[in-house]
């Protein structure tokens, strides 16, 4: 009888355990962003702590992020509710694996970003979340030499060249500064700014006639560029020491200039070419996998993340800028206020033409960058014929694309399979 009583007790215990109400689990926010310990903690304590429900924020590298997501998708169910990742991460997924988010009623202030977030479909597959990018900055002394009628927030490449030429003539020194040093991010300028602005592509249009015009235009700008730019890597240094009055760089590499002498410098959008205002956004978004346990709860969290006050809290936590219209508070660092305004103007401009970060290249990302750096060194520094160099470098680029099988990314037209170098 003892044995029977014991079994009966176990059975009753199991039944009670099954019948007992289970506390709802926190919403799992599975992200590739804000991974450093300090940023992740700030996301939990400063961004998500005011949300009405519990959120389990879990940042991971791209590999583990993708592995768990794919496992849940294959299983047909899972615990991930909200995905946070870069545009390139989402573009590698099938749109069928994400919940359409058009009915959410929130989106970014940038029509361009919202179009990207549709991933080639008719509906939003992710909601733009936050952004970082590269911009222009200038010493306010240079403003007196702007070409007549030029709007610093809507410059063309021709106006930028004329401006640099005016400063050159007035000071007797070439004062445009470019991060062409060993650790400079020059390749991102060519991939995300020059090529989209002049060719409306990067890979397909690499050796096009429009690309020849792009390089010829950059050579004109180089004539008014401080020749020591081949040693420049963080343009904040040249702004502060006066070696350059007009510069291009990543927002983080301009920060010291604005924080140390905020009244001396101005930030503004990159210039536009014949094909629009090319710029390279590091665009992160939020999505919901089709296997999410509670889609409504996930949608509510995404809506919360797009609130202006949440976007500002995210900026403080991560250094990434808002994608919605917000008025930045005065207690932010001077660099954030100055560069944030320029980023917002650039991404929301009517002629914005984003050149996205290269995607799908794996370990050959460095080889891809080298194609553009080699082209710069041969054409601009070495004075070689543009057409000859592009035809030569085209072979190296084509080999990389075929070996990786990487499909095209914006602004190149989509491809089935490896992006062709036309």
Model region roles, listed by residue range:
Residues 26-44, 360-364:
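Extracytoplasmic "Venus flytrap"
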Residues 27-28, 45-112, 144-147, 245-246, ...:
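Extracytoplasmic "Venus flytrap"/periplasmic binding protein-like
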Residues 30, 189, 216-297, 420:
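Extracytoplasmic/periplasmic substrate-binding proteins
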Residues 32, 117, 317-378, 406-422:
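Long, aromatic- and glycine/proline-rich binding clefts that accommodate carbohydrate-like moieties
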Residues 39, 141-142, 171, 304-327:
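Periplasmic-binding protein-like
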Residues 86-135, 159-161, 266-268, 422:
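Hinge/lid segment of periplasmic solute-binding proteins
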Residues 123-129, 134, 158-203, 210, ...:
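Extracytoplasmic/periplasmic solute-binding protein
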Residues 161-168, 201-232, 258:
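Glycine-centered hinge/linker elements that transmit conformational signals in sensory
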